[in-house]
Amino acid sequence: MNIFNISPAVLIPRLLALIISLTFHEYSHAWMAVKFGDETPRWAGRLTLNPLKHLDPIGSLTLLLVGFGWAKPVPVNPYTLKRKHPAALMAVALSGPLSNFILAVVTAIPLRFALVQPIGTTSSLLPSLFEFLLYFMYINLRSEERRVGKKCRYRRAPY
């Protein structure tokens, strides 16, 4: 993704895709943590769909410029989860990428059933959102340092 060679008709849908997906992704982490009993995201003001609480300005700009970026991570305290099972933290970690997959499927439905016809670059919101969400899900599942995949990779079953 090179922001300097993109028309406004393509840039605006990408910005919308970025805002929607990063916000929903981080909200999903916060919601799942609260469901498992950790009130840290609520106390930090992260249990909201307000994009200003979730978007990191530098990470968002980097995502637009080079295709790799980040949002503000949701604080989660694994010691306050009601279930001390390793799957609880794994569920919190996987809720973000799962939310990206759900958003990708939801945006693909109108395209699949021809409810929305993309015409040139002026109607590129849904294809851009779909591609962005799948890419974002892939990046989050990679087992790199400080990524979601690493948290899940080292969790062991209790048996």
What are the residue ranges of the model-derived segments?
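Hydrophobic transmembrane alpha-helices and their immediate loop junctions
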Residues: M1-R155
